[in-house]
C-alpha cells in the first residue's frame, strides 16, 4: 500500500496522477474511475472539477442527457458520508441511465462521498464490467487511497482556475479577522487590540480587497472555509 500512496503523492501533474491511478486500479481489474468535486470560491460561488477515466462517449451522453439531475448515486453522495455500492434498486430515479451505463462497462461500482473540512463536496467512484473486481479488497484499497488522492489533487490544482489562491494576511489582519469572526464590531475590536477604530476598519478593508469580497461577512466566511482562521 505504501508504494501506491507514494506513486500518488509524487505525481507531477493531473495527467500523471490519472496514469498512476489507472495503473493502481487496473491491477484490480478496475478500468474506470471518476473524481468529481465542487469547490467553494469567493462570494459564495462554486466551481466543479472532474478528473476521470470513463468512456468518453458516455461522459458526453451523460452531460447531454442532463443525468446529473437524476443520478441517484451522486445525490446520495452529496448528502451522506458512507460509501455506496451500486445496485439496481438504488437507481430508482435513474433507471434508464443505469441500463445505459451498463452497456459501456459501468455496471459494478462503489462511490465514496467526499466532504472536506475546507468546504469541498463531491464523489469518487470506481467501476468495472467485472463483478468480482468490485470486492472487499478494492473497497479497502480505495478507502485508504482517497484522502491522498484528494489532497494531491488540491495540491496540483491550487494555483489554477479551480482552487482559489489564498492571499497571505499579516499578523494584525489575522488578529482583527478572528475578532470579526466571533461577531465583534470594529469599535469593539479597536478596544480589544488597542487600536483606533479607523485603523481596524482600514485593516478589514484590506482583508476584503485581498479576498475579493464585498463585505466583512463574506471575508469571514471565506477565511473559515479555507482555514485561514479557526474559531
Residue locations for each model-derived region?
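GAF sensory/regulatory domain recognition
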Residues: 37-61
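Regulatory sensory and allosteric helical modules in signal-transduction proteins
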Residues: 53-102
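Short hydrophobic beta-strand micro-motif common in sensory/regulatory domains
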Residues: 108-114
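Sensory-domain boundary capping and coupling elements
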Residues: 115-128
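Regulatory loop-to-helix N-cap segments in sensory/regulatory domains
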Residues: 128-139
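Regulatory hinge/linker segments at domain boundaries
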Residues: 155-175
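Short alpha-helical "packing" element that flanks the helix-turn-helix/winged-helix DNA-binding module
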Residues: 173-180, 219
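Recognition helix of helix-turn-helix DNA-binding domains
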Residues: 185-218
Amino acid at each position: 500500500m505504501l508504494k501506491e500512496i507514494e506513486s500518488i503523492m509524487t505525481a507531477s501533474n493531473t495527467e500523471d496522477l490519472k496514469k498512476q491511478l489507472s495503473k493502481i486500479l487496473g491491477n484490480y481489474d478496475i478500468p474506470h474511475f471518476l473524481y468529481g468535486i465542487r469547490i467553494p470560491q469567493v462570494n459564495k460561488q462554486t466551481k466543479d472539477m472532474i478528473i476521470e477515466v470513463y468512456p468518453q462517449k458516455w461522459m458526453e451522453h451523460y452531460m447531454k442527457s442532463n443525468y446529473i439531475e437524476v443520478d441517484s448515486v451522486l445525490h446520495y453522495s452529496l448528502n451522506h458520508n458512507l460509501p455506496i455500492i451500486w445496485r439496481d434498486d438504488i437507481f430508482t430515479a435513474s433507471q434508464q441511465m443505469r441500463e445505459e451505463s451498463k452497456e459501456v462497462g459501468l455496471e459494478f461500482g462503489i462511490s465514496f462521498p467526499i466532504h472536506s473540512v475546507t468546504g469541498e463536496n463531491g464523489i469518487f467512484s470506481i467501476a468495472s464490467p467485472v463483478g468480482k473486481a468490485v470486492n472487499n479488497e478494492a473497497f479497502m484499497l480505495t478507502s485508504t487511497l482517497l484522502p491522498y488522492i484528494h489532497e494531491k489533487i488540491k495540491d496540483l490544482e491550487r494555483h489554477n482556475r479551480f482552487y482559489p489562491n489564498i492571499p497571505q494576511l499579516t499578523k494584525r489582519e489575522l488578529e482583527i479577522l478572528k475578532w470579526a469572526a466571533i461577531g465583534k464590531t470594529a469599535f469593539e475590536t479597536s478596544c480589544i487590540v488597542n487600536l483606533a477604530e479607523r485603523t481596524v476598519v482600514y485593516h478589514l478593508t484590506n482583508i476584503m480587497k485581498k479576498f475579493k469580497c464585498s463585505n466583512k461577512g463574506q471575508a469571514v466566511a471565506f477565511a473559515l472555509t479555507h482555514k485561514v482562521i479557526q474559531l
